[in-house]
Amino acid sequence: MTTCAPHTRLSRRGRGENRSSEGETTEKEPSFYTGEGETPPNSTTETPLRQHILGTIHQRVRWEPAFGGARKNAARHLERGAVTPGPWSHLVFDFSGAEFRHTVNLSESYWGAGANFSGCSYRETANLSASVYAAAAHFTASTYYGKAIFRNSVYRAAVHMSGCDYRGQVHAQATVYEAETNLSENTYREGADCTRSTWRGHLNASGCTYRRAANFAECTWGCDVTLAGCTYEKDAVFMSTAFHGTAHMEGCTYRAGAYFSYSEFRGDTDFSGSVFRHDTEFVGCRWRGRADLSGCTLHHVSFEGSSHLGAITFRGTQFSGGRCVFDRSVYAGGINFTGAAQT
């Protein structure tokens, strides 16, 4: 782990200072052992030292309520933007490649200049909840063996969180992403809960695998989203969700229930080539743009009570399971069943 100010690898001044060739005074920060070409320190002292370093950083990057009040109302403070950064929040922190062997608690942190957690390994719970990321946040290619907790956080700049392996549950409820977010090629081995979250920048969550339930209910996608090529082994829940931009969900496989009921699709939506193996529900949905469900396999599908202002196409789609419900629906933009069949 390293902290650094912009354009330099060394930051805080104080005891143990080193003088650079340019005459600047710098101090090296303690590093976490990564196991790459190094002799590991004594295991009886390494973990307590690492925990102490991490605890010290946490204390100094924690935000405080701007107008007082209890910290237990963290979500309310963050929603209002009423927080004051910690004394070290202006530094850049680089934890890349670190192995955390015990529970990590970095909740309620304010990362003002950037934080890099790429390539990290978390053996126990990683609690990064209720945090503010004012600059780019990097979490790529990390492995979480225990719970990963990101809920109630605010990402004000780009988020890089692709290629991760989540072996425990993921809690990312009520999180706000204000810039571009990359969650592609992730594997979620336990439940993933992203309910009531908001995305305002482009989201790329393509190529992900969800081994357990994936819950995106009541989310707001105020941007174009790419969720193409994903595999859902258990229920995929997108109920009461608002898609304000173009939604790319083509080529996905849903091996259990797929629930999109009461959602709103304001832009064009592409489900083409997707396979729905179990109950599929679009009950009460509002489709303002075009909807492409061509070349799909739909099992026990229901569009009951939905409205389509744009054209919808089922060209070459296979309907199976004996139940295909379109009752009380409105198709103002036309509907195309060319080459579709019920099996």
Residue ranges with predicted function:
Residues 1-343:
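N-terminal leader/targeting and pre-domain segments
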